[in-house]
Amino acid sequence: MSQAGTGVCGNGGQEDSAAAGPFSFSPEPTLEDIRRLHAEFAAERDWEQFHQPRNLLLALVGEVGELAELFQWKSDAEPGPQAWQPKERAALQEELSDVLIYLVALAARCHVDLPRAVISKMDTNRQRYPVHLSRGSACKYTDLPRGTLSENEAVGSGDPASELGNQAST
């Protein structure tokens, strides 16, 4: 059985993000602002009739495909998107925006409060991926070695928002 951070699951081949420096999003627009902007855009064009969950999901998948095309056939040895040419960076920005717009629209149509859902999901991830078992490991939680500590002891009593960047996603 592998130890956390070594073994079969590996470390995910993380890029050196320190070279790019720290990044943070601008505080605006909020997800609610994005939801409202898109709802107004669709209403002005009488497109709400087409925005059923299935259609929004398929549009989202299509946009994710367009985003994936930007990365297709690029080698892992090539510099990351931070070093792309301006035209490629602009396309990346547009496709990521399309993905976010459709994700927010789908969540709104399904009445899912994304910020609350993210906090809940990160709490679940924190329980599934205790730091002492998952640090440096790309293993799925079902494949992590189990130590002698219970999940409650391993998770600790820290603030749920404090470790958002330290957990693997599922």
From Swiss-Prot:
Catalysed reaction equations from the record: dCTP + H2O = dCMP + diphosphate + H(+)
Cofactor note: Probably binds two or three Mg(2+) ions per subunit.
Biological processes annotated in GO: dCTP catabolic process; DNA protection; nucleoside triphosphate catabolic process
Gene Ontology molecular function: dCTP diphosphatase activity; identical protein binding; magnesium ion binding; nucleoside triphosphate diphosphatase activity; pyrimidine deoxyribonucleotide binding; pyrophosphatase activity
Region (Disordered): 1-25, 149-170
EC number: 3.6.1.12
Name by which UniProt lists this protein: dCTP pyrophosphatase 1
Organism, scientific name: Rattus norvegicus
Organism lineage: Eukaryota, Metazoa, Chordata, Craniata, Vertebrata
Gene name of the record: Dctpp1
